[in-house]
Regions:
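A short helix-turn-beta junction within AAA+ P-loop NTPase domains corresponding to the substrate/partner-engaging
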Residues: 148
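Portal/gating segments that form or line small-molecule/metal binding sites
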Residues: 1-145, 155-210
């Protein structure tokens, strides 16, 4: 069974809205789009290329699919490894309104999310990677369908904007399985779910020692 890996670009204060371009997502009056672009360098590109080569398919919400579809099909340089993989990989788009996805190969998922994701995880090789797709990502987290988090944390504070980990998600322990830092200061943390969250307290012993 393949793993579902959630890949997210986020600021230090957890904002994931509109990372790649000013007009990517202006919902809620957000006007700071494109905040990750100054930090893209050879090392971040190398990270992205390495991980996209591990993908067997890409799972996206409709808006993220349409945003990516407006750019990547037009990158036809045969030496661009990232574009080559993104364009050839199967895309699975969760949507109840999209009927004819133009960026192929693509399949629209309109049925029960948990059922469809379990089927996709049981069928095929390589990671099933989620990129962006804020609403979809929250649904996957809430239903316990994420096997690994790949969180790209950029050295910026935005102070406003949509966050991935909002109120209402189930408390969950995480285990760090990897961490990398780019030359530009981007830190990529990789976590896997570690079961229910546990709690404790600090108490001094009879001799006053912690």
């Amino acid at each position: 069974m393949r793993r579902l890996v959630l890949t997210t670009f986020a600021s230090v204060d957890g904002v994931m809205q509109s990372p790649g371009a000013p007009g990517e997502d202006r919902s809620g009056g957000f006007e700071m789009g494109g905040w990750l672009v100054p930090y893209v360098d050879a090392s971040t590109v190398a990270f992205a290329v390495e991980w996209i080569q591990q993908a067997g398919g890409i799972l996206l919400g409709r808006r993220s699919y349409e945003m990516l579809a407006s750019y990547w099909p037009h990158v036809t340089d045969p030496d661009d490894v990232l574009a080559r993989h993104l364009n050839r990989l199967p895309k699975y788009v969760v949507s109840t309104t999209l009927t004819d996805p133009a960026w192929r190969p693509a399949t629209v998922i309109a049925g029960d999310l948990a059922t469809e994701i379990k089927r996709l995880k049981a069928d095929g090789d390589g990671e099933l990677q989620v990129h962006g797709s804020r609403r979809l990502a929250r649904s996957l987290i809430g239903q316990g369908l994420v096997d690994e988090y790949r969180l790209w944390v950029f050295p910026v504070l935005l102070g406003a904007g949509e966050r991935l980990f909002g109120d209402g998600l189930p408390p969950t322990g995480l285990r760090m399985v990897g961490s990398r830092t780019s030359e530009s200061g981007v830190v990529v943390h990789t976590y896997q779910p570690a079961g229910p969250l546990t709690f404790g307290s600090f108490q001094a012993d009879a001799d006053g020692r912690a």
